[in-house]
From Swiss-Prot:
Belongs to the endoribonuclease YbeY family. It comes from the Bacteria. This is Endoribonuclease YbeY. Its cofactor is Zn(2+). Binds 1 zinc ion. The keyword rRNA-binding does not apply. InterPro entries: MetalPrtase_cat_dom_sf_prd, YbeY, YbeY_CS. It is found in: Cytoplasm. The keyword Nuclease applies. The lineage of its organism: Bacteria, Pseudomonadati, Nitrospirota, Thermodesulfovibrionia, Thermodesulfovibrionales. One of its GO terms (cellular component) is cytoplasm.
Length: 159
């Protein structure tokens, strides 16, 4: 399976290396698809020929606007995920879009005593799990399952 990641940077506060983001996302998606635990992915499409994810980095104002519009929350957030799970006749799969506010990620990293990239890895894993159908706001058990998967992913990303 080929994985394509589109990265768009629409903010200028925090410098984000697109190549590193692409590499991390590919590792996360590959781990989730190649793991022996087939319950990890809620996607019913098995072995798509080509998988696409879009990642857009935005500033505080745009994130607040999107959070208000799509979640009814008038505040800045770190990440929003918009799953598509559209399977094209060609066998390609567009998982969806992840919108990230790097400034918020940076402040959370400081708060949790992590590096920017450690926190961004957690945010990327979280967003990809949302694209795969997980939702921590549905129930406590779903939230626990999602946190456990995030930890598995992060353990796999360590050098």
């Amino acid at each position: 399976m080929r994985i394509s990641v589109e990265v768009i940077n629409r903010q200028r506060k925090i410098r984000v290396a697109s190549k590193k983001v692409i590499s991390r996302i590919k590792k996360i998606v590959s781990f989730l698809y190649e793991t022996k635990d087939k319950k990890l992915s809620k996607i019913t499409v098995k072995n798509p020929a080509f998988l696409l994810i879009s990642v857009i980095f935005v500033g505080d104002q745009k994130m607040k606007e999107l959070n208000s519009k799509y979640r009814g929350k008038n505040s800045v957030t770190d990440i929003l995920s918009f799953p598509y799970l559209e399977n094209e006749p060609s066998g390609n799969l567009f998982l969806g879009e992840i919108i990230i506010n790097p400034k918020k990620v940076f402040s959370q990293a400081k708060q949790y005593n992590k590096t920017f990239w450690q926190e961004l890895d957690r945010i990327l894993a979280h967003g990809i799990l949302h694209l795969l159908g997980y939702d921590h706001e549905v129930s406590d058990s779903e939230a626990r399952k999602m946190r456990k998967l995030e930890q598995k992913i992060l353990s796999n990303l360590k050098p």
